[in-house]
Amino acid sequence: MIAIVDYGVGNIKNVERAVNHLGYDAQLTSDFDTIKESSHIILPGVGHFKDAMTALKASGLDKLLIELQDKKPMIGICLGMQLMFEHSDEGDVEGLGMIPGRVVSIDTPYPVPHLGWNNLESKHPLLDKDVYFIHSYYVQTPAPIIATAEYGLPITAIVQKDNKIGIQFHPEKSGDFGLAILDQALKGGFIHD
């Protein structure tokens, strides 16, 4: 069973539908035992970084996720990806610290938020099409960046560190291509030894 962490932030039902559509057993949950027993953890989210961290801390889910970070594959989607990092300039708040790096404001001549379809740029053969973004902040990280999207500057679109994968765009809203990316992430990601 794949645990989709329900911490009261964002449109997470679409993520559950997408994972189930791929043939996996996904469950929205905030129950500690269910999360501990899961095979994978997905941390979704849309909204403000500070509000999300406040919700995770209030429930104790932040400590649980940190405890499990090396024991289970984890996928962060959109705000969920950003929460996996050390710090965000959005609200000047510490994140979960699972992946080195920080979340910074998109400083570009283009409209912010970065909203709509944008092409991925990557050396990985799967990652060559448009995906759906909606965000005003992006990640700067020394961790392996799997794909970027150009938006006046290179936006980190997919990052992977060990068993942790961050996806800035919404694979659940990116059609069959987005589902294929989500499936690949659930199968272990994009870096293989």
Protein language model features and the residues they cover:
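Short acidic low-complexity segments
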Residues: 1, 26-37
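Short, surface-exposed beta-strand/loop micro-motifs that present aromatic residues
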Residues: 153-160
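N-terminal beta1-alpha1 ligand-phosphate binding loop
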Residues: 2-24, 169-173
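Cysteine-nucleophile active-site neighborhood
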Residues: 47-114
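Acyltransferase
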Residues: 169-193
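Beta-strand-turn-beta hairpins that frame and shape the catalytic cleft
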Residues: 126-129, 160-165
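Pocket-forming structural segment of enzyme catalytic cores
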Residues: 86-153
